[in-house]
Amino acid sequence: MKVNVAVSVAVVFLLTSLLPAEAQQTSKATPRIGFISSNGAPGSPSALFDAFRQGLRDFDYVDDKNIVIVHRYAEGRLDRMPGIVNELVQQKIDVIVAVNNVVIRAAKEATKTIPIVMVSSIDPVAAGYVESFAKPGGNLTGLAHLGRDLSAKRVELLKVLLPKMSRIAILWDTSGPGPTVAFKEYEAAARGFKLELQSLEVRGPHPDFPRAFQAAKTEPLDALVVVANPLMGEHAKQVLEIATKKRLATMTEASRYVEEGGLISYGPNSADLYRRAAEYVVDILKGAKPGDLPVKLPSKFELFVNLKTAQRLGLVIPQHVLVQADKVIK
């Protein structure tokens, strides 16, 4: 009898070992990835979300097949962010993907154990998110950019477009650590180019942009740098309309502002960041600890120029700038 039992167990073990790997995995819990967007709405198309999913597919992780992506939207209502993050934490999600500083901060406050992957963060060390780039520590890692060089490059580009530029304004949201770090970087860049800088400040969730522009000094401004974040993104159309009426050349890091009427943008290629964020998720699902995965910098950058806006402002964009541009809106 004992021999028969032993033989039966051996046969079951043999048959199980011969099953395809995919069939064996069905007994395991399917990994669940929480993806949180500060803007957008359920069902709305998102090229960046598609880039993230493609990044996962490149490693054979397919949504609704061997992973589940739980996508949540704040729909521009940033005050909802803590509640959205806490909902995913309560669901015991396996990884949280935080697309920007607003989501990163909410996720970091909500959990010390669930891995968090940053898609884009202004200097995470200065913001207090990680201990260092090489050894983040804790439960957070991902992609970030050191804005000092990028801020200087943006101011330099404005100087190329406006050789006589002497005064610039920085429009920024004072309610978050990311824009605060960025503003300090632009202060340093302005000093480097011997420019006078005017701070135009707003604060979420109900920013008063007309008042912010009225707070500018009586001397005319030459250009406006918009520090991109979810609050600015939500009100981009209003901001750009005011800037254009005041005949201000606008610069920002995000190409979407140029597509909505801004003059020029220079910054990391967003789709590439989302694809690379997927690589972090894959590493974590395979057992890596986020605190041991170094924070990486962008490797691809893009320059967008809006010729229609330039014409409205009476500006002529130099040919060498147009040749370098990844996209020119005519």
Please state what every model-predicted region is.
Residues M1-K330:
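Short hydrophobic alpha-helices and adjacent helix-cap/hinge residues
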